[in-house]
């Protein structure tokens, strides 16, 4: 382990918390400061679209109690001077560092008049709206956030319309067969689907679509993706392009003392021909925060590449949907277990005959098997 005296971690969500925990557990005993834009202790985001909307507020991440006094909550990094190794905060304070972990996350894309769901405050505000008696909820975007909000709203007895620009919800992430099944699953559970069209404007409860139609709803919620929080790095000298560009080891490109982790990190993945990827899911932030911290302590020459197989899981109307790898890179997909008509199946995705992704619906054991095959670079 190389000698570092001061480490700053920017971002107090999952990746930042895991970085702090790992630094201490790996023996770093120098000055360690965690900067978090939110006033809350680090919390789990996946429940925000599920249990929090139903009334649960206990989402604190295990390990948050380990943070101690060197945690600046409610403070935001606004500038990085990589030359002088200084992070500038929104109150004018300057934090010097020998090592820096960039885990500043991402923020939701917004549309005027639309509720978004990223923070605990977002979830509590949306819950208050649901509790106020709104009967018809319109969800923009059928990704995992949109699907979970639609599920929760139906559980609460609300009428739900889901608008998605693709041919089926989650078509890009799940592939044609699983996305087609998901569309039917939504409809069987009472969700009205409007697909293949974009929302262009929301005024009050009026939602205008790209084809000229206007839909009405009491409450409009958006799950339209996120944008990485990199503006504070402008002028820092770090390479930024849809995230912080990194080496395979998560070191910021060209840097020997800055690493990145979580939603903000974009790095070349060896399983995919060193294609640059950025992953926005819980499991990636969980693992990447720890690996980035270990690599920062080890130094660039001893750092290990991060090559975990990306994976995520969601529950939609009682069905467990899991993915591994990057199905959207495939030129072939094939059902390899179960049957979509029986609501239990697994799909393998390949490019040039080699597995690159998998999707499983109510088939966790098949997903585990396929994930191992992806990591091994096996043929479909």
Task: Go through each PLM region and give its residues.
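Beta1-alpha1 glycine-rich phosphate/pyrophosphate-binding loop at the start
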Residues: 2-72, 150-173, 369
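A short, polar/charged loop-to-alpha-helix boundary motif
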Residues: 364-378
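Short loop/edge segments at beta-strand edges and connector loops
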Residues: 73-75, 81-82, 118, 164, ...
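FAD-binding core/adjacent interface of flavoenzyme oxidoreductases
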Residues: 2-8, 60, 66-138, 208-210, ...
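Mid-to-C-terminal Rossmann-like scaffold of FAD/NAD(P)H-dependent oxidoreductases
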Residues: 2-5, 266-364
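Glycine-rich Rossmann-fold phosphate-binding loop(s) that bind the pyrophosphate
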Residues: 11-14, 37, 118-119, 140-143
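FAD-site-proximal beta/loop scaffold in flavoenzymes
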Residues: 112-134, 205-208, 213-291
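Rossmann-like dinucleotide-binding cores of NAD(P)H-dependent redox enzymes
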Residues: 134-136, 144-200, 308-316
